[in-house]
Amino acid sequence: AIHDQGLRIDGRRTNAGDDGGQRIPAAIHDQGLRIDDRRTTAGDGEHATLTAIHDQGLRIDDRLHLVGGQTGEAGGGASGSAHPICAALAEHGAMTTDELRKLVPDLTLMMLDELEQLGMIRVAEPDGASGGPKTDLLLCRTDATPDHRPGERQRLIIDFLEQHGESSWDELRELYGLQRGQVRALERAGWLTTREVPVWRDPFRGQRVEPRAEDPALTDEQAAAVGEILRAHGTPAQRPWLLHGVTGSGKTEVYVRLIRHVRALGRRALILLPEIALTPQFTGVMRAALGEEIAVMHSGLTPAERRDQWLQIRRGSIGVVIGARSALFAPIDDLGLIVVDEEHDPSFKQNEGVRYHARDAAVMLAAATGATVVLGSATPSLESLNNARRGRYGLARLARRVQGRPMPTIELVDLRDQPPARGDREQPDTPISVLLEQAVRQTVDAGEQVILFLNRRGYAPAMACGDCGESLQCTACEVSLTYHHRGRVMRCHYCGFSAPVPRTCPTCGSDELTSTGAGTERIEEHVVQTFADLRVGRLDRDSARGQGLQQTLQAFRRHELDVLVGTQMVTKGHDFPNVTLVGVLDGDQSLRFPDFRGGERTYQLLTQVAGRAGRGDRPGHVIIQTWKPEHHVLRAVRDGDFDGFAEAELRLRSRQGYPPFGFAALVRLNSADQVALTQAGAQLRELLTRPTSPRVHVLGPTDAPIPRVRERYRTQILLRSSERTPLHQAAALVTAFAESLRATDVRVSTDIDAQSML
């Protein structure tokens, strides 16, 4: 929505340059986020708002106290919406934020923050809470020479302070066994003064980064991109920028130079990344280039670390904030630059609770704060590309890799002609072709590394009976159970159900159960069995739990692994200079999805994973195994022809009226009662197709691609329109319809600009 004509926030549409636009950052920061382009049934938004408040540093069990007997008259500029808070506290006394929310349903962090700063309320943590910053006691030698004669150990402390200056009590306690009582005695005697300072928890877990010795020289393309963006910064010509750079072209260095510029102007920067897996490497590069004034915000932090980061950002001691999509709501004043790296990535879309697209919200936030927003990608979304072509966005291109490194060569291997490599007795055929297996051997023998990509975790996607042909199904979802070799367990990747592998077929009693297909576990096992001398690692959601993610990435980066098998977690943004071979085991996988974005997703995914090869001194090679080597998307990937692919895809979208040439909303309905769901779907279609209803094209209702999840049946209706307004009007009808179903089990939600049809 923001990509196009502006996003409706707090019930009003706002465009860049709107005089009232300065209210938007507050609305975004408090994450009350009343976005018209998000329709949910009661409860979804409520839960999301509470979660957002908790994530931003306000605990739901914090106690709120009214200060000085205020009666609810919010003076000093407090907004009128804050009055009910003071009134509730005056009537009911101190209460937790969760209790207050029940009395003031629209409670947001911004309201409480405003009242706290005005001194009208006081926020106190519950007993035993450890969310605030730790403190350290600093000791400093005074200029006085008191009459008090210090003892031997006290003399050591005084001498140390005279020699080293202000020092930590923790340090002196470790060196000399200094006790608090001795500190108080010296302070009373006048030998020293003390002060407490906050000690922030380290989100980098002690990982040290060496500062850059010198900056790399910019290529002509990088220098031109930096110059173009900075010339427009802070002028009437300022607009969002699309930085379209091939993999390895140095987009990160462009970000560094832009950040330095806005920091020199006294403003701050926000960088959004699609995956927390990218954060450690990316922050390492930024810390080396920019210093330590960097905060990170993502779900991988502990609650205490997240709170410390939030408090430092709020106090203004942090110049650069890096994080996943939720970092968009960090309390950053004086915002000068927003970078959305890998802007095409679908994980920037929040699909639960308050639905929003972080890229689009970043564009709106930049317009409201006067910041420059840069959207970076090697494979831009067609929406962003279309905006650049129409002049709404500026376009800066990096067409070549840095240091003259060549792009990797890409080879399409036709699986119809290429025999599979030898497998084991249970599964004689493997998804690895003989050609790819030979390439792995040659690459490792040359002292180089390999990435094998398969976007399917587990050992096998199904287990079937050799006699009756039935596969093991989830009892709560209409999907096959995935076989996980570790623990010999069948697991549903949608609801989390798991069960041991049965000894016999539940349908016919046969003991001829065999796993079919392959996931990353099986590929890892096959490589280990085939190449006993190779060091093999795996990176997927199962192996990445806890510290597994960073341990695997660090081991691969240090060349403690020869081959890394992984899902799409290995495709995004990683820089492994010694990787020269990438093997894609199933190049057709995302083409099979029932989604009009299937071709775009395939091009992006394959180009991104191919970009991991040849980023160092040696050229890279990519082998993509496919059953459809003639497919135009795969040919475009092979040829590195983004422009040709985009042109063909945009022509197709234009003929069909799909985004970016039209607008779409996906209405999802679900219920445990299939009959009630069918009736609700028919009623909603009838409502939307009445002559008096907004003029939108209604497709459905139809079963969702996965018709049942968590014991709830699912159906969906696709709404399409050439204009935003009718779509918003139709969404309002859906919301009213959902309200009428409150007493039933049918749940309804509307996803504007849905990124997935699943």
Question: Could you say what each language-model-derived stretch is?
Answer:
Residues A1-S377, S384, R389-R405, V444-D445, ...:
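Accessory, non-ATPase domains that flank or precede helicase/AAA+ motor cores in DNA-metabolism machines
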Residues A213-G227, P236-T678, E686-R690, P694-V696, ...:
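Inter-lobe coupling/hinge segments of SF2-like helicase ATPases
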